[in-house]
């Protein structure tokens, strides 16, 4: 028959599965020896569990222990006190040279453009100090010490939770810790190998004329209808043509009030004059939106390779970043952010990454915890920063208690958990990721 062994090591970092072909009359001692042959774990360190019960009688057969075909056994590898004494003495030796010489590495990065580019992608804060030996050494040691503390803290938490391995709450916390580590690894992998996904994608705008008035129109093939704001409809002189019988409420991502509909009005796109109908709607941050109704009617093609809208053979180029409405940029500046690797910040809605140089500016707007730290040290010369922490006090108390306790269970103190929740607008998953990154 075949059984599966779920192996958990002493650190709790690695879990493996082992499939074994066994016989019903095989003793537990023979099974331990088979596991040792496959994994090199000594039988004295093997703690086997079946259906949540520790099995210790090595003389009993698998049949006597009620182990049947297809069963899974849990194996927890726990070193004895005498066996762990040797690694403790050996841990001092690797800690003696904990890292390479920072100055040697700095010179290597300066001499190798490829390595330097890699540092700029993965650790922008180090790359900014590469020409300052003292600053480089300081940041290098701080980074190494932080990683060591985080690793030791994770091991300590997992070891504490493994003291009661069949406690559902403990296992749920271990699962959350492992999941957050995978999320962080996934983020770092994306920033290293696919950094373009973190750039800001600007919307597609065109210069058009409606009834002779110039308007910047957003091209949105995901919108069902062509939309115009009441202010622009008034400026274009077509507000008097609104048929209010078509009023109502638009529901989608949120709701908006529909004032009515303009059944037809001339729109100039490029050199083409095209009749178009408009839905006049409040509550949108865009002056005019060319929807799918108009794009399909005139068989328009959004050609991203040419960065143009093609209508009836004419190519109308989309506006550049500097020409799009400023309201779009202001919305991006007000976007809440979370901390990313190497001192970067990541927008929660767009995923856009900002370097360390712009992190402090955005922290003053989005309110991460680091913006509140300089306030007490210099309240007098910086009234703007001193006023920022003022609304934080009531906000810190608004987080659910269970969210704070989840972060405390990951090794953070209560104040650190609250600051992490403030920095992520109450998102527990992002807050846990910040704590693991040394927030």
From Swiss-Prot:
<dbReference type="InterPro" id="IPR001969">
    <property type="entry name" value="Aspartic_peptidase_AS"/>
</dbReference>
<dbReference type="InterPro" id="IPR009060">
    <property type="entry name" value="UBA-like_sf"/>
</dbReference>
<dbReference type="InterPro" id="IPR000626">
    <property type="entry name" value="Ubiquitin-like_dom"/>
</dbReference>
<feature type="active site">
    <location>
        <position position="220"/>
    </location>
</feature>
<comment type="subunit">
    <text>Binds ubiquitin and polyubiquitinated proteins.</text>
</comment>
<keyword id="KW-0813">Transport</keyword>
<protein>
    <recommendedName>
        <fullName>DNA damage-inducible protein 1</fullName>
        <ecNumber>3.4.23.-</ecNumber>
    </recommendedName>
</protein>
<dbReference type="InterPro" id="IPR019103">
    <property type="entry name" value="Peptidase_aspartic_DDI1-type"/>
</dbReference>
<feature type="compositionally biased region" description="Low complexity">
    <location>
        <begin position="383"/>
        <end position="398"/>
    </location>
</feature>
<dbReference type="GO" id="GO:0015031">
    <property type="term" value="P:protein transport"/>
</dbReference>
<feature type="domain" description="UBA">
    <location>
        <begin position="398"/>
        <end position="438"/>
    </location>
</feature>
<keyword id="KW-0653">Protein transport</keyword>
<comment type="function">
    <text>Probable aspartic protease. May be involved in the regulation of exocytosis. Acts as a linker between the 19S proteasome and polyubiquitinated proteins via UBA domain interactions with ubiquitin for their subsequent degradation. Required for S-phase checkpoint control.</text>
</comment>
<keyword id="KW-0963">Cytoplasm</keyword>
<feature type="region of interest" description="Disordered">
    <location>
        <begin position="82"/>
        <end position="101"/>
    </location>
</feature>
<dbReference type="Pfam" id="PF09668">
    <property type="entry name" value="Asp_protease"/>
</dbReference>
<dbReference type="InterPro" id="IPR015940">
    <property type="entry name" value="UBA"/>
</dbReference>
<feature type="region of interest" description="Disordered">
    <location>
        <begin position="333"/>
        <end position="398"/>
    </location>
</feature>
<comment type="similarity">
    <text>Belongs to the DDI1 family.</text>
</comment>
<dbReference type="GO" id="GO:0004190">
    <property type="term" value="F:aspartic-type endopeptidase activity"/>
</dbReference>
<dbReference type="InterPro" id="IPR029071">
    <property type="entry name" value="Ubiquitin-like_domsf"/>
</dbReference>
<dbReference type="Pfam" id="PF00627">
    <property type="entry name" value="UBA"/>
</dbReference>
<dbReference type="InterPro" id="IPR033882">
    <property type="entry name" value="DDI1_N"/>
</dbReference>
<dbReference type="InterPro" id="IPR021109">
    <property type="entry name" value="Peptidase_aspartic_dom_sf"/>
</dbReference>
<dbReference type="GO" id="GO:0006508">
    <property type="term" value="P:proteolysis"/>
</dbReference>
<keyword id="KW-0064">Aspartyl protease</keyword>
<dbReference type="GO" id="GO:0005737">
    <property type="term" value="C:cytoplasm"/>
</dbReference>
<dbReference type="Pfam" id="PF00240">
    <property type="entry name" value="ubiquitin"/>
</dbReference>
<feature type="domain" description="Ubiquitin-like">
    <location>
        <begin position="1"/>
        <end position="82"/>
    </location>
</feature>
<keyword id="KW-0378">Hydrolase</keyword>
<feature type="compositionally biased region" description="Low complexity">
    <location>
        <begin position="364"/>
        <end position="375"/>
    </location>
</feature>
<keyword id="KW-0645">Protease</keyword>
């Amino acid at each position: 028959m075949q059984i599966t062994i779920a192996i958990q090591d002493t650190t709790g970092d690695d879990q493996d599965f082992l499939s074994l072909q066994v016989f019903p009359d095989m003793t537990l001692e023979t099974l331990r020896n088979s596991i040792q042959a496959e994994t090199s774990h000594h039988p004295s360190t093997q703690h086997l569990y079946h259906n949540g019960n520790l099995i210790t009688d090595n003389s009993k057969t698998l049949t006597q222990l009620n182990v049947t075909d297809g069963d899974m056994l849990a194996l927890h590898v726990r070193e004895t006190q005498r066996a762990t004494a040797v690694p403790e003495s050996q841990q001092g030796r690797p800690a003696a040279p904990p890292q390479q010489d920072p100055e040697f590495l700095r010179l290597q990065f300066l001499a190798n453009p490829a390595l330097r580019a890699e540092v700029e992608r993965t650790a922008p804060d180090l790359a900014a100090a590469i020409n300052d030996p003292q600053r480089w050494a300081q940041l290098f040691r701080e980074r190494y010490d932080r990683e060591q503390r985080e690793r030791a803290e994770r091991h300590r938490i997992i070891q504490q939770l493994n003291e009661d391995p069949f406690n559902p709450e403990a296992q749920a916390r271990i699962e959350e810790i492992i999941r957050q580590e995978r999320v962080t690894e996934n983020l770092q992998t994306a920033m290293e190998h696919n950094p373009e996904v973190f750039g800001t994608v600007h919307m597609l705008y065109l210069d058009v004329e409606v009834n002779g008035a110039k308007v910047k129109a957003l091209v949105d093939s995901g919108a069902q209808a062509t939309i115009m704001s009441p202010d622009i409809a008034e400026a274009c002189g077509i507000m008097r043509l609104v048929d209010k019988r078509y009023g109502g409420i638009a529901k989608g991502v949120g709701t908006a009030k529909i004032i009515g509909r303009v059944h037809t009005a001339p729109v100039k796109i490029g050199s083409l004059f095209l009749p178009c109908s408009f839905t006049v709607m409040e509550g949108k941050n865009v002056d005019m939106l060319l929807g799918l109704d108009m794009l399909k009617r005139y068989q328009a093609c959004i050609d991203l390779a040419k960065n143009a809208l093609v209508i009836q053979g004419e190519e109308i180029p989309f506006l550049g970043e500097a020409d799009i409405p400023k309201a779009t940029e202001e919305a991006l500046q007000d976007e809440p952010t979370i901390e990313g690797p190497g001192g970067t910040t990541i927008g929660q809605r767009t995923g856009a990454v900002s370097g360390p140089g712009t992190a402090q500016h955005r922290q003053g707007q989005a309110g991460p915890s680091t913006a509140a730290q300089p306030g007490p040290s210099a309240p007098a010369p910086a009234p703007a920063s001193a006023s920022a922490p003022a609304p934080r006090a009531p906000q810190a108390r608004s987080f659910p208690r269970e969210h704070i306790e989840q972060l405390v269970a990951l090794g953070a103190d209560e104040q650190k958990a609250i600051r992490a929740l403030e920095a992520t607008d109450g998102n527990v998953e992002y807050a846990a990721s910040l704590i693991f990154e040394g927030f």
